[in-house]
Amino acid sequence: MNDFISSLNNWQALYALSNTMLSLANSGQWDELIEQEVKYVTLVEAIARNPIEPDNSVFQEKARELLTKVLANEAALKIKLQARMEELRVLIEQNGNQKSLVSAYGKLSGNVLMPNDFNQ
């Protein structure tokens, strides 16, 4: 019975942590979110090591409900992470463009160009 309770406690902790992670993503706290990922994986591993036995239908149903909620949070989190990855991709692209401009026009810095310089 204690193993069942321990396993169900892990499921509840996983759901609570998934709520926390989604909240962190919603508020843009990406570093904190990454820190929570390690705890999340550890809980998933603990659940895998200590599954709820098939003959305990009450605990299995509770775990199933929690799993459904966790999966919904994961789906929402995935959408947030994809949006963040797109933001970072745009920033990296802009940085690359800026470096190209600096490289191209930096060679001309310190030079005064006169209109007739372009005709030669």
Swiss-Prot record:
Region annotated Required for homodimerization, chain positions: 1-50
Main location (coarse class): cytoplasm
Similarity annotation: Belongs to the FliT family.
Annotated protein name in UniProt: Flagellar protein FliT
Subunit organization: Homodimer. Interacts with FliD and FlhC.
Keyword Transcription regulation: yes
Domain of life where this protein originates: Bacteria
Keyword annotations from UniProtKB, A to Z: Bacterial flagellum biogenesis, Chaperone, Cytoplasm, Repressor, Transcription, Transcription regulation
The organism of origin for this protein: Cronobacter sakazakii (strain ATCC BAA-894) (Enterobacter sakazakii)
Keyword rRNA processing included in the entry's annotation: no
Pfam family of the protein (one): FliT
GO annotation, biological process: bacterial-type flagellum organization; negative regulation of bacterial-type flagellum assembly; protein folding
Gene3D superfamilies named among the record's database cross-references: Flagellar protein flit
HAMAP family reported for this sequence: FliT
GO (cellular component) term, any one: cytosol
Annotated stretches, region: FliD binding: 59-97
Function of the molecule: Dual-function protein that regulates the transcription of class 2 flagellar operons and that also acts as an export chaperone for the filament-capping protein FliD. As a transcriptional regulator, acts as an anti-FlhDC factor; it directly binds FlhC, thus inhibiting the binding of the FlhC/FlhD complex to class 2 promoters, resulting in decreased expression of class 2 flagellar operons. As a chaperone, effects FliD transition to the membrane by preventing its premature polymerization, and by directing it to the export apparatus.
Compartments, record wording: Cytoplasm, Cytosol
